[in-house]
Amino acid sequence: MHDIRAIRENPAAFDAALSRRGSAPVSSDILALDEARRGKILAAETAQADQNKASKEVGAAKARGDEAEFERLRALVAEKKAEIAAMQAEAKELDTQLSELLAGLPNLPAEDVPQGADEADNVELHRWGTPREMDFAPKEHFDLASVQDGMDFETAAKLSGARFVLLSGAVARIHRALAQFMLDTHSEQNGLTEVNGPVLVLSEMMYGTGQLPKFGEDSYQTREGWWLIPTSEVSLTNIVNGSTIAEDYLPRRYTAHSLCFRSEAGSAGKDTRGMLRQHQFEKVEMVSVTHPDHSDAEQKRMLRCAEGILEALGIPYRTIVLCTGDMGFGARRTYDIEAWLPGQNTYREISSVSTCGDFQARRMNARFKPADGGKPQFVHTLNGSGLAVGRCLIAVLENGQNADGSVTLPQALAPYLGGKLTLNTDGTLN
């Protein structure tokens, strides 16, 4: 959500920022609705003052026996009451229209975000690790001999349809180990508070983080009205929904491992094989709630937390900053981390780390109380994958593959796998 006062003060700057995201200028429409709404509110207040004045005079007219004046004033009070109700209803309708217009507009990009139309204009910041040279043709994860029994797409399709997978045996254990390793790292080393939250949330929570109203088709809703979360960002960020937090309570840093659900609307034909794009998947999420002065530094901190997971696993990656045309709806700035997948001979996204400024906080009405006793201000919110567990499994399998189809697993997983770091071609660990 956007600050209407900032739009009033500098509508040209607002339109210019929107244009960087490819959106048409809309400040004139916003200000027209705002002016009409404020006009109705002022008219209702004026009518209320007239009604109050007439109400006081009714008693005086009655006391002095002026029946004609008494009746005139009574009629005036009733007339003003009807006027007030009508103007308040009109103001409410205009307020709804204004809120709906503002709710459909994306966040404004930070000044340092590169200008661009799509992913081709994203800017690489740095790389870590060197892709391993293999003296054989590397395979994609789903073709490896060692996962043929443990990564079952056929049975999953029988159970649920396309874009699902059934993991079993050692592959399921490695998947679980990765999630546990991420959670332990974030909670024990990176200082995040572990949360186990609901995966079913109210519409208000989806609105708070920006999934609604514009992107409802991307998620699943139950008959009872709950939404299945597309990411734990929804559950974690909305912990502060409707709250006013003491400044010394900031920053709040959360992490959670959860199931996530996405309809993948608009993704027909993309990544139809394997685990890269699923309707149901698992992710370890990071969320920070900060003072506005500290959000840029916090984003870099979160980025390092996510990058550190890949470094510990020995997975080569590159980090890019998304251009204005490729950022998500609620983001002010986004860094993507892409892991090297030798089976595809390319880097693929495994994490996005975004700062949203006060965009989500305004939708959630989440504020903090300054330590100096000043007026409450909106917090800043940030979110990032730390990491997508299924995609991390893909990266571990493909980067650790051997010529015979077995996989050498990262040393970091040894404590979670009983020290067994070889996934054999028969699907066993040793």
From Swiss-Prot:
Pathway: Aminoacyl-tRNA biosynthesis; selenocysteinyl-tRNA(Sec) biosynthesis; L-seryl-tRNA(Sec) from L-serine and tRNA(Sec): step 1/1. Coiled coil: none annotated. One of its GO terms (molecular function) is serine-tRNA ligase activity. Keywords: Aminoacyl-tRNA synthetase, ATP-binding, Cytoplasm, Ligase, Nucleotide-binding, Protein biosynthesis. ATP binds at residues 262-264, 349-352. GO terms for biological process: selenocysteine biosynthetic process; seryl-tRNA aminoacylation. It catalyses: tRNA(Ser) + L-serine + ATP = L-seryl-tRNA(Ser) + AMP + diphosphate + H(+); tRNA(Sec) + L-serine + ATP = L-seryl-tRNA(Sec) + AMP + diphosphate + H(+). L-serine binds at residues 231-233, 285, 385. Gene3D superfamilies: Bira Bifunctional Protein, Domain 2 (3.30.930.10), Serine-tRNA synthetase, tRNA binding domain (1.10.287.40). It is found in: Cytoplasm. InterPro entries: aa-tRNA-synt_IIb, aa-tRNA-synth_II, aa-tRNA-synth_II/BPL/LPL, Ser-tRNA-ligase_type_1, Ser-tRNA-synth_1_N, SerRS_1_N_sf, SerRS_core, tRNA-bd_arm. Its EC number is 6.1.1.11. GO terms for cellular component: cytoplasm. HAMAP family: Ser_tRNA_synth_type1 (MF_00176). Homodimer. The tRNA molecule binds across the dimer. PANTHER family: SERINE--TRNA LIGASE, SERYL-TRNA SYNTHETASE. Consists of two distinct domains, a catalytic core and a N-terminal extension that is involved in tRNA binding. Belongs to the class-II aminoacyl-tRNA synthetase family. Type-1 seryl-tRNA synthetase subfamily. NCBIfam families: serS. Catalyzes the attachment of serine to tRNA(Ser). Is also able to aminoacylate tRNA(Sec) with serine, to form the misacylated tRNA L-seryl-tRNA(Sec), which will be further converted into selenocysteinyl-tRNA(Sec). This is Serine--tRNA ligase. The lineage of its organism: Bacteria, Pseudomonadati, Pseudomonadota, Alphaproteobacteria, Rhodobacterales.
